[in-house]
Amino acid sequence: MSKVLVETSARHVHVSEKDLETLFGPGYQLTVKKMLSQPGQYACAERVDVVGEKKTLTGVSILGPCRKETQVELSLTDARSIGVKAPIRESGDLEGSGACKLVGPKGEVVLEKGVIAAKRHIHMTPADAEAFGCKDKDVVSVKIDSDGRALVFGDVVVRVSPSYALAMHIDTDESNAACAGRDTMGEIVR
C-alpha cells in the first residue's frame, strides 16, 4: 500500500470566532454547505472578499469550524495576482506570514498576518502511517502519474492524527502542474 488520494485545496479562509462576528455580525454561526474529506471539516455557505495591495479575490470560501486564529490559504498565483506575501507554511504557522483585508457583509478585518500558501501535505491516521512506514512530520516525495504531466512532488509533510482521513492536499497551482483530477492517486516514493 503506497498510493494515496490526491485532493486539490482551492483558495479558502479559516476564521476565528471573533473575526467571524466582525465579518457577519454578533453571534453569527457558520452554515455547513458540504462536508469535506477530513472528519469534522466542512465548506461553508458564507464567503468573504480577500483584499490585497493590487486586487481583490471575491467570494472566497470559508472552511469550518472556526479556528483559534484566522488564516487565509492562497496559491502563489493568487497571492501574486492580488499583491500579498504568502510564504509556504504548514497550517497554523502564521508568524511573519502575509497581510490582507477580509471583507464580509457586516464588517472588515485587517489581518497583519495569516496569509500562507499551504505546504503540500498528507493526512494519515496512525494505522496509515504504520502501513506506509511513516511518522508525524516526516518529509516524503509523491509521484503522480498523470497523462502527459507525470511529476514527483518533493517536500511533502506527513501529518499523523487519529482524527485524520488518508489524503494528500495540494493547491491549485500544484494540481494544474500535475494535471490532477478528482480521482488522482499519488505514490509515496520517498
Where do the protein language model's features map onto the residues?
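Short beta-strand-centered segments at strand-helix junctions
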Residues: L5-E7, H12-E53, T58-P105, V110-K137, ...
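Amphipathic terminal alpha-helices
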Residues: S146-G148
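Short coil-to-beta-strand transition motifs
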Residues: A150-V152
